[in-house]
């Protein structure tokens, strides 16, 4: 349950919690406001919400339609968030647009004692075989924004639903049937890396 997930997250006493696909009023979650539940579980945290989907009714999948959907990204911070901005990712303009979310990311700022800021990017990227141009455009846009913050002397943290296979190597062709593409790490700015890459093979599994 959402309450169970919120309580589990709180039990780790985290500094930050990033949760995607948080429904405000959606058929799939029986119109329960999941954001309200999470805020109750993480009551002592500052919070930011970035809406990335608002559909009156989605007729997909056809055998069991999503129906009404209103959802987004939720960030919870132990430290005060002084400013936050929602940025829209480029998405497909073809017919598939009607079956995908309005992908976005939020940029939230947390002041640090040395006068700089910790800038937290929370994202939800496109999935289900979108075009290479869309994937590349989303990664390029995100990378440029992160690089600007790095060059300004700020600390940058990025998390969320990448909708990529973060474990797979970019030249790994072992699983061609998977919808999740390996993340093109070479497109990241020089000073950025995935935390998962610091883990051993056993820890990744």
Residue ranges of predicted features:
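Active-site environment of divalent metal-dependent phosphoester hydrolases
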Residues: 24-27, 55-58, 127-130, 163-169
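Active-site-proximal beta-strand elements of phosphoester/diester hydrolases
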Residues: 1, 85-87, 117-126, 159
């Amino acid at each position: 349950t959402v309450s169970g997930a919120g309580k589990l997250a709180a039990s780790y006493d985290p500094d930050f919690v990033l949760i995607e696909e948080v429904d405000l009023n959606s058929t799939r979650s029986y119109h329960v406001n999941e954001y309200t539940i999470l805020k109750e579980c993480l009551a002592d945290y500052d919070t930011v919400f970035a809406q990335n989907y608002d559909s009156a009714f989605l007729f997909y999948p056809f055998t069991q339609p999503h129906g009404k959907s209103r959802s987004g990204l939720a960030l919870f911070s132990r430290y005060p968030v002084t400013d936050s901005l929602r940025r829209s990712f480029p998405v497909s303009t073809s017919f598939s647009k009607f079956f995908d979310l309005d992908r976005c990311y939020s940029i939230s700022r947390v002041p640090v004692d040395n006068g700089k800021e910790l800038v937290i990017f929370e994202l939800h990227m496109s999935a289900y075989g979108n075009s290479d141009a869309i994937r590349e455009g989303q990664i390029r846009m995100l990378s440029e924004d992160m690089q600007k913050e790095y060059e300004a002397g700020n600390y940058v943290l990025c998390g969320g639903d990448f909708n990529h296979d973060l474990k797979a190597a970019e030249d790994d062709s072992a699983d061609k049937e998977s919808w999740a593409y390996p993340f093109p790490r070479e497109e990241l700015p020089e000073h950025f890396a995935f935390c998962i890459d610091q883990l051993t093979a056993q820890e990744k599994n």
